[in-house]
Structure formats: structure tokens, C-alpha cells
């Protein structure tokens, strides 16, 4: 698996067959083909440092790598000069080349490539990317050295509605809206009492949306295999390249990758990728699901012999403070026409970036075809720095694939060294110590952003939970974006990774939910790794394909402690038992290291508590029924249990603490959310429900949040002092600096206060925001659950608070002002600079 932090970086190869690709590829592809840019010289990458005290040969702009043991790595071969970027075929704006980011193990990042200067039919000026600086976290290399991975988020065109012929390359799209992804078009509204999504979907729109992107591929890449990878498209997506259909993916919560090699053109020819997303069959969800290409997109160019999709698995079968064994399996495929003798090398780097001795898997012949060949090796680690909640130490594995002595592909896999067990005596133990899950269950949308959540916003949300004492998240009721798990790894948060909200039976009248696809046969090309033959008897189903996808993608994250096969599944016990048996077997085959549970609702009526379901599951999971849970875990053979969903009643926590086998609980919910509106219009979210979040949608703690903060032993925070007479608008930014990267965002908070600065929580006055400088207001919110647009620059205060969410459009000073009738206005400034956002490590504010 390739870490999502790597996928955000522009990388180039030191090998001849991709020489110069960074200059042309980034200029042509990153600029969205709206520009003509000068290609950078493609120099050889530095050799891998593998000698004690002697680093690898220094690559361009890079520092000498730290030495491990073995022989000094050779210098990468010099590449040829990259040719100039070609003119844009559609005249869309050229965008900035992404900044290079340093390898945190000690190698400086590549320079961002030059953006274009002008599109051939009117594209605006692009900006040169900045030089990479320090890495974002020790021990996590930020860039592949051979495989080319290009961020593909910019330069898209969007049309809301159906568009006949939009799958064809020659389709006229010049009037379409230009934007970048991630993009959630549903959150843009409007709210509508008669929306087909109903109150369960937050009364927001659904339907069909089309995305198109024009790009060119340099001739230097014509010997590679070219893939397009989506982290998530909501929903029922169809992807086309130059008019050829690549595949369909119904489930909007999973990533997928298509091979475009046979259908792309190299050189100056225009390529067009088209994506149709369709959630028009409604209702389709019990909660807000969003719409569109709402997660990141990446374009990958790899040698014909390369590591297969998400094929690297890292586990730690032994892990103590004295020593650990890192066990690695990876699958190499051969897209060529002749068998190749392949060797695989693994280099582990510790959290400080120091490389350990390299380990080699025995050479094997890899035949052409998709089946691939499995390589395994073990890496011994003395005195490892264990991954734990308070010390989230991250190691990394660099896997090099070599043919005839030359490295043709590589893969960087972050991982943590830890031991984790669940049993009926001690519950959950992490590194030999009993740990209780102080958990919350949440949905993936955040405030005015919907489901297209910038990485900074996820970082902010997880930091807010940590302040309340939370140490675990249940991803309700679907897998989250890759960067969410990256942050959980870095911040020491445990994750219960949930698959589905439904199986074969719809919930309520939600005719468009996943039950419509669950048991259907998946096509031969799904965009995911093949389902193991032992599980898929004949054609694989969509549920088998999606679980394979999720587990293979997520299994290397130390934060992921367990999988949940579903939430409150309505299938009858006979159907459910057979399916559950297959699901657990599939999870164990793909990831033997992790346990499997399910969030069961009222299971006592059908015999599950002491019957088949309890026996099949590794860990008993129960929603809202403590007695059933206690019965299930105490019935022989005993097993661990977890309260997968509970309300805010604090009495349950004393039961958790007094029951060793009970691993912990997850409160519903961690934060208010859109959809599942319990009351009538115009309430559009959960906030009026007695089971509201520990915080509102914008992160303001609700009263119960402070209660659980104290119960969980977190340092106390005090609610703001309150006043009675509104006098002024006080404006504050959660961060004084902002990067020109759409993964970064600043929350500008407007507080209605009295003359002494005390918050007037009774105020619901409209707040008007204005902005000057290189910034834009991407949304407004207050935490209110009433139907009120998230777009524009006006928001009614809720509990005396309103927010403007701001992103930078260029470097410089951004000034935001807020005004309200009869009150003194406020001003806040944010300094924006060019750069690439990097995920935090450890305690993040």
C-alpha cells in the first residue's frame, strides 16, 4: 500500500524510462493542460543509503541519506532533460505545481515543477511550485523514488445534471464550471423540504453530476503502465478515458484504481477523463452522504514490473520493548510480455529516520499477467519504539523491486510496531497493558464542508476529540478517507473500521442504499484487488469486492484495531450467520492480525447473544444493551466485548471500568451531523435529538462533552464565561498562517460578546463576513441544525457563534471582517504562504 501522504507528492524517477517526467508531467498534468511550461531536468535519484556510516549518493537538491548496513547504494542514472509542457487543449487555468516535500528520513524533497504561463485558449497564469522543505514527521518517507505519483485534484470541469455524450473525448465542455476536487456538490444546496433525500439525507439535493479533466502525458512515460486512482466517489460512479469505459463502482466509500495504459495517448495529444456519479435513486442513506468526487485523485505511472495495488502487508507478530519482528508480504505483477527474474529489497526506517539493515526476499520469476508473485521477508528490530496512544511512533518500509540489478519500482509503507490482543479475561491489551476504549462514533461529514473535508479540518476535528479525552473513533457506518487513518496513526487514536450500514435488507424505505448492490455479481474489472478465490466461489459479489478493498487498503495502519462488518444489520439470523461467517473468514485471510466485530442492535430476541453470531465474531459488539453484552462475553467460551454504540448515560462507563473483558464503549455521537433529522422541517440534522454529539458540527463542546471529559480523566477545559447584552463581534482565527494548498483551511470564529468580552450565548444575530487579500470564504456555519445555506457570507449566530471557513488563493495577507447590525465589528488576519500542507504528528492543535 502506498501512503496517502506519498500520493500527494510529485515524484520522479532516476531511471532512464521516466527521465525528465517530472518536468513535463507536472507541467502538463498538474497544470490541467491549461499552460505552456518549461520542463525541469530529470536527474537521477540518489542511491539508497545502505552502508553503516556511509550514505547513498546525493540526489538533486537532496541531502546525503543516513547509512544503514550493507553496501553503499549506487547513484541513480541521470535522466534526460524534460521537454516543455504542452499548450492546454481546452484553455482551463494552469494551476500551481505542487511543492516538493522532503523525505523525513533525511532526503530533501524535489522542487515543485513549473506551472504553465498561459493556456492556449485563455487559461490563466500558473505558478511555479516551491522547493520542498522539511518533512512532516520523522520516520515517514514522503516520496517514492522510482514510481511516479501525481496529485490529480486540480483542473477539473463540472456539470450538475446529466449530459449525453459527456463520456466522449470530443464533447464540448467549455461552459462547464472549473474546480478542484475533493468536491461535494450536494452540500452546496439548496435545502429543500421536498428533497428526495428526505430528512435522513438532510434535505439536500441528489442526482447526477459529471466531471471531466483534460491532460497530456509525456512521451517519456510511454513505456509505463498508467493508472488513475480515486479515494472515493459518491456514488455509483462510471469512469471513462477518451471515450472508453473503465469501470463502475456503486459503493461511494471505497477507493479504486483503473489501468488506463491501453487507452491513453502520449506526447502532445489531449486525453480526457470523464466521471459520472449518480445518486439519483433516493432515499439512499439514513444520514448525509454527499455527492461527487469528494476525495483525492491520483495518477500513477509505474514500470511494467511493479508492486500490485495495495499488495504490501506489514505486520508485527512479535513486538515487545526488547525486540520485534516485522513480517512483510508483497505481490509483484508483470505487465510486460516476457517473464522477469525479480528480487525484492526491504529497508525499514525507524521514527527518527535511521535506516536499518536491508533485507532481501529470494529472487523469483514473475510471469506476465495479473496473478502476480508473492514475496515475503522478515525484518528484526532491536529495542523498537512501540506505537501507543501516548507515543504514536511511526516506522516506514521502503520496498524496492529490482530487475537485472536495476530498481524498477518502489513502494513506501508507513507502519507501527505494537502488540494488540482481545480476550475474554483482560479485554483489550495494547503492548501488554489493558486499555479501555474511550470512544465516539462519528460520520465523515464536517460542518459546511460536507464530505469533501480538507486534511487540516480532519486534523482539527481529531484534536478537538482528544481534548475531550477521546482515544478511539468508530467510523460510522463506512470506511473514511485515507488521510483520516494517516492522522489517527500520527495522533495516537484507535479506530474501529466499519464496513457497511446495510447488507441485503434496506433500512426504512431507502431503496437506493447499498442493499441494492450488496449481493450482485461484480464485473471482471472493479478497480480493486481480486477477491481471494477461497472466498469468491465463481464471480465475486460487490460486498466481497468492497471488503477486500477496505481491508487491503487499511491493514497497515497501527491505529486500526478491529473491523466491524456492519451496523444494526436487518438480515434475519439464518441469512446473517452464513454471510457473517464468510465476512470474518475474508477479513482473517487478508489480515490475520486483526479481530472482527459487528455493531448489533437488540440481538437478544433472535438467539445471537449465546448462539451463532457470538461464536462467529472475534469480539462481541453491542449497541444500547449492556445486559446482552455482559451475557454474551461471559458465556463459554468467554470473549471480549465492546459497547459499539451507547447514549450519553455516564453509568455505562462504571460498568466498562468494572468489567475486565469489556474493552470500552463508543458514544453516539462524537459530533452533531447532517441528516437523520429527528424532527420536522426545517431541522436538517441530529442536533435536536436527545442523542446529540459531544460537540456541535463546528467543534463547540456541548454540555455532555464536558461531562465525559471529566469522566475520562482528560485535563479540564472551562466553558467560556457568558454575558447578557451583545455589544461587539470578536473575530479570531484558529491558525494565524495558511498555506496555498486546498488541504489547508482556517476557521475564522465570530463570537458575539458583551463589552467585557463575555460570550452572549442567547444571540442569534446574522453575522456578515467579508474578505480581502488572497483568500476565499468556502463556507459559513454556526453549528445550528436549521436549514440555512452553507454558502455565501452571512450566517445566523448559534449560541452566540458563527464561523467563516477560509482558504488561501495565493501568498499574502488575508483580512476577514465580520459585522452585525448594532454591534461593533471585528477583524482577523491570516498570513498565507506558498507550500504544501503536511499532516501533523503527535499532539496536534
Name each model feature, range by range.
Residues 46, 53-57, 295, 374, ...:
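The feature marks long extracellular or luminal low-complexity segments
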Residues 148-166, 180-181, 186-187, 282-283, ...:
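Substrate-binding clefts and catalytic carboxylate motifs of secreted carbohydrate-active enzymes
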Residues 241, 323-365, 373-375, 748-749, ...:
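Beta-strand-rich binding/interaction modules
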Residues 250-262, 266, 283, 382, ...:
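Active-site mouth of glycoside hydrolases
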Residues 3-6, 17, 29-139:
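Ser/Thr-rich, Pro/Gly/Ala-heavy low-complexity intrinsically disordered linkers and tails
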Residues 162, 201, 206-310, 335, ...:
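Accessory beta-strand-rich segments of carbohydrate-active enzymes
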Residues 221-224, 264-270, 339, 381-396, ...:
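Short glycine/proline/serine/threonine-rich loop/turn segments at secondary-structure transition edges
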Residues 137-229, 285-293, 716:
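Extended carbohydrate-recognition surfaces in non-catalytic/accessory domains of CAZymes
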